A protein has these predicted regions:
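Bacterial N-terminal signal peptides that target proteins for export
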Residues: 2-14, 20
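C-terminal segment of classical bacterial N-terminal signal peptides
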Residues: 17-27
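Contiguous segments within soluble domain cores/interaction surfaces
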Residues: 28-130
Length: 130
């Protein structure tokens, strides 16, 4: 093997390595979990709450086109409540979504926020309602 052959093989190997990285990087980035934060606000109606949900990716950028459902329940009272699932809709700014739900009593609640698109992510947020 001449030095020239060796250089060609090295160059080919480096190119292959680099292009594999370029091809695989987006696939890995898409499977990284999303970060889901929320704030709850009271509306005029007793026990009704409006949620503002903020979804960001692993790089901290807002995630648009997310599909989000919120299911609330009381951890201390399994099977006792049946608040309908709430679907969140875009709230005007990238990565922000809003939804409303009405609780059935005051006390400790837990919300399961489930993102099904673009990356499956599930978070649970506990909160107190008075
Ligand atoms: Cu209850």
């Amino acid at each position: 093997m001449t030095a020239r052959h060796f250089n060609r093989i090295t160059t080919a190997a480096v190119l292959l390595f680099v292009s594999a990285g370029w091809l695989l990087a987006p696939a890995f980035a898409q499977s990284e979990p999303l970060s889901v934060e929320w704030t709850l606000a009271k509306t005029g109606k007793r026990l009704e709450r409006e949620a503002l949900i903020i979804v960001t990716n692993a790089q901290g950028q807002p995630v648009s086109d997310a599909s989000i459902e919120v299911k609330v329940d009381m951890p201390s009272m399994p099977m006792m409540h049946a608040v309908p699932k709430a679907t969140a809709t875009p709230a005007g700014q990238p990565g922000r979504y809003k939804t409303k739900f009405t609780l059935e009593m005051a006390g400790e609640w837990a919300a399961q926020i489930e993102v099904t698109k673009p990356v499956r992510t599930k978070v649970v947020k506990k909160f107190n309602a008075d």
